[in-house]
A protein has these predicted regions:
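Active-site/ligand-binding-proximal alpha/beta "capping" segment
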Residues: 129-173
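Alpha-helix-loop-beta-strand connector modules within alpha/beta enzyme cores
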Residues: 49-73, 118-141, 184-203
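Glycine-rich anion/phosphate-binding loops
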Residues: 76-93, 117-121
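Hydrophobic faces of well-ordered beta-strands that scaffold small-molecule active sites
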Residues: 8-16, 41-43, 70-74, 99-101, ...
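Conserved N-terminal beta1-alpha1 strand-loop-helix module at the mouth
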Residues: 1-43
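Active-site mouth loops of central-metabolism enzymes
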Residues: 9-25, 70-82, 140-156
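Short, acidic/polar
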Residues: 20-33, 55, 81-88, 153-163
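Glycine-rich, proline-tolerant flexible connector loops at the mouths of alpha/beta enzymes
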Residues: 17, 38-58, 106-118, 170-186
């Protein structure tokens, strides 16, 4: 397990293209990234799953062509159970073992009046689905050194984060931050709360 090793590791995040014409340029960029031998390459997922097939194609190409571990993002907001199950099967078929399980950004035109009826309201719902699938995925989740914008306070945010880890998250990646002290304080608080999984700092 790469993140369990006590050595400095570097990873990259790749954004899938929105158009077919840009796919070759992304492949070229990933070829250059692979030469740096990163610990892994993370491949994001389009809002609402719009570029989800590109996510898998790019992740599989990096893994198969360069032998670099890949982390495929998977979001669940506005998704049906059938859609998520299909995506899980596609990820398994592609040989991808690492998944970043996210709720995803809520589309601006989405009806928010009946959220209680959504199949996947939070990332934890997707994490549970992945665990119940029977596949041996390594599941990652997001965390927020400055607290999630929808949380009332950081204590509540860390409580929900602990639930995510208990549900099956094996590592966490932070949202981008610009003050190292925010990260240090956050790490102290989550360790106090019993969250012991590796934390990847998201920087740009």
């Amino acid at each position: 397990h790469t993140l369990a090793q006590e050595t400095l590791s570097l990873s990259f995040e790749v954004f899938p293209p929105k158009q077919d014409s840009a796919f070759d340029s992304v492949k070229k960029a990933t070829e250059e990234i692979a030469k740096l031998r990163p610990a892994f390459v993370s491949v994001t997922y389009g809002a609402g799953g719009g570029t989800s097939q590109y996510t898998l194609d790019i992740a599989k190409n990096i893994k198969d062509s360069y032998g670099v571990s890949t982390l495929a993002h998977l979001t669940c907001v506005s998704s049906t159970k059938e859609t998520v199950h299909r995506k899980i099967e596609e990820i398994k078929a592609a040989g991808i073992e690492n998944i970043m399980a996210l709720r995803g950004d809520i589309p601006p035109d989405m009806d928010l009046s009946h959220q209680e009826k959504w199949t996947y309201r939070h990332a934890i719902d997707l994490i549970r689905e992945l665990k119940e699938s029977g596949a041996d995925f390594c599941i990652g989740g997001a965390c927020y050194p400055e607290k999630h914008p929808e949380s009332h306070n950081q204590k509540e945010d860390i409580h929900f984060l602990k639930e995510k880890v208990d549900a099956g998250c094996e590592f966490l990646t932070t949202q981008m931050f610009f003050d190292n002290n925010l990260l240090y304080n956050f790490l102290y608080k989550i360790r106090e709360a019993g969250i012991t999984v590796p934390v990847v700092a998201g920087i740009m």
